[in-house]
Amino acid sequence: MKKLSLLLLVCLSLLGLFACTSKKTADKKLTVVATNSIIADITKNIAGNKVVLHSIVPVGRDPHEYEPLPEDVKKTSQADVIFYNGINLENGGNAWFTKLVKNAHKKTDKDYFAVSDSVKTIYLENAKEKGKEDPHAWLDLKNGIIYAKNIMKRLSEKDPKNKSYYQKNFQAYSAKLEKLHKVAKEKISRIPTEKKMIVTSEGCFKYFSKAYDIPSAYIWEINTEEEGTPNQIKALVKKLRKSRVSALFVESSVDDRPMKTVSKDTGIPIAAKIFTDSVAKKGQAGDSYYAMMKWNIDKIANGLSQ
């Protein structure tokens, strides 16, 4: 009788252990790594509280050239899914992402995915070859919707039990971005034609320019090149002296000294800081993808209408 009772107790204990283990497995959240704060924010809007999310490049830092920390390698090696921009961002310059996923023993299209998949690529000036793509596709809100859709698709594949949750969030989020896209087109269209030009430090507004029908100019073309050389500044100053542009802009993640020199030499004021490669710090204006795009649209429209 004692043996029978002991056996029953062991069986019940094992059953309880199995039930707890099964519950932990069922409750286990996906671990997701995003290469920068913009992709992380879009992911958060789709994934909600269903994932554990880590963003590699800190807010305010340049994602073109970054040196991953040991913690980044650890998080990446443990991740169920990794989202990166692609099109010459993390794999351009010092190719930091290529090295990271190699060290983390991750495989493309199995562990890590480009959220820019199916975006119509724009190239750097006078270039059409691989490695010369302009990576700033997210500055067109329509491309932001493509990013969100790709993230939703991959999360649904990795975590099918929450597929309907991800789809529902995508529908709401994409509608929000679509509405802002229409607002952008309307606001930018009201800028006087002779003043219609976005002038920034890096030439990162090609996608924005095409989407919202506004030309752009810059000091240097991409952050992996020389930045703010005397010849670059001289060329932009010469161009601006022939224009009626009323405002300059400087990105939040770059050194503002070259643009201050341009402003001094042309007499054109710097209207505002705008966001390109990173969202703002939490609690500040522009601390999400939606908020940074709204900020940019408002500052550009207001600055160039003066």
UniProtKB/Swiss-Prot annotation:
Listed GO biological process terms: cell adhesion; metal ion transport
Principal subcellular localisation of the protein: membrane
Keywords: Cell membrane, Lipoprotein, Manganese, Membrane, Metal-binding, Palmitate, Signal, Transport
Molecular functions (GO terms): metal ion binding
Signal sequence residues: 1-19
Locations listed in the record: Cell membrane
GO cellular component: plasma membrane
Covalent lipid sites (N-palmitoyl cysteine): 20
Pfam families on file: ZnuA
Membrane topology: Lipid-anchor
Binding positions (a divalent metal cation): 64, 136, 202, 277
Annotated TM spans: none
Disulfide bond sites: none
CDD domains linked to this entry: PsaA
Coiled coil start-end: none
Lipid-binding residues (covalent, S-diacylglycerol cysteine): 20
InterPro entries with a match to the protein in the record: AdhesinB (IPR006129), Bact_metal-bind_prot9 (IPR050492), Lipoprotein_PsaA-like (IPR006128), ZnuA-like (IPR006127)
Stored PANTHER family: HIGH-AFFINITY ZINC UPTAKE SYSTEM PROTEIN ZNUA-RELATED, METAL-BINDING PROTEIN HI_0362-RELATED
Known function: Part of the ATP-binding cassette (ABC) transport system SloABC involved in metal import. Binds a metal with high affinity and specificity and delivers it to the membrane permease for translocation into the cytoplasm. May act as an adhesin which is involved on adherence to extracellular matrix. It is an important factor in pathogenesis and infection. May contribute to the formation and accumulation of dental plaque.
Family: Belongs to the bacterial solute-binding protein 9 family. Lipoprotein receptor antigen (Lrai) subfamily.
Name under which the protein is recorded: Metal ABC transporter substrate-binding lipoprotein SloC
Originating species: Streptococcus mutans serotype c (strain ATCC 700610 / UA159)
